[in-house]
Amino acid sequence: PQLYKEILTSVFEKVFEIAQFYRAEESDTTYHLNEFISVDIEVAFAEAKDVMEVLEQLVVHVIREVKEKCESELKLLGRELEVPKMPFKRITYDEALEILREHNFRIEWGEDLPTPANRKLGEIFDEPYFITDWPRKLKPFYIKPKEENPKITESFDLNWSWLELASGGTRIHRKDMLVERLREQNLNPEKFEPFLTYFEYGMPPHAGWGMGFQRFLMVITGRRNIREVTLFPRDKNRLVP
């Protein structure tokens, strides 16, 4: 859906989607599935900071509504929700590495943050927080590099506790840059030609994000396993029912 919703921004300035995602996911953990629901937006003439504000407003609105209208259900789950304060804290990838080094984590620049590191950050920040400015090689080909430092991207992840809830950023809207990034990631641009064709006619600058619905439910309900908040979970070991 990612590539299709980007195309749609050339016609509709604001694109919203709630849909099933299917992924060849190799990870077999308590927070990964091969089929899941994603909540997505894509906005024309927007940057990462703009859609980050939309994301935090959505999270706060949902938490507030659940807290006010689902008191008995939350009590049954033994869950007390606190409405997060806006704006959410923002730290860069570099700042995250520095914080983790102070807690004896040794992560080289350009490496992804492993689960133990995310758990430690979740202990330090007790509310949702953004990690921004991720290295270029850690993000998909359609994420825009920063003009002042192309090794870094205009990207963000939204974390809460130890979970990554959402990921997004400013998108590349020029075909030549997309082709360059595809080749950089050892992908064949010819296989993406139906997508790239639309960029020949002019694509507006755009930004967006996708949020894993079940992971958000995990945070709301306090469950530790994504299968507890999913009807008929499907992972690498289970497809039926």
Spans of model-derived segments:
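Class II aminoacyl-tRNA synthetase-like tRNA-binding/catalytic domains
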Residues: 1-44
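Flexible loop/turn segments at secondary-structure boundaries
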Residues: 3-5, 23-28, 47, 137-141, ...
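Hydrophobic/aromatic-lined pockets within catalytic cores
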Residues: 8, 12, 23-27, 59-67, ...
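A residue-level signal for conserved active-site and pocket-lining positions in enzyme catalytic cores
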Residues: 11, 41, 96, 131, ...
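Active-site lining segments that contact anionic ligands and/or coordinate catalytic metals
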Residues: 13-15, 36-38, 126-128, 153-155, ...
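A generic structural motif
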Residues: 40-51, 162-164
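Metal-assisted phosphate- and nucleotidyl-transfer catalytic regions
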Residues: 57-161, 184-203
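Active-site pocket scaffolds in enzymes
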Residues: 169-170, 174-241
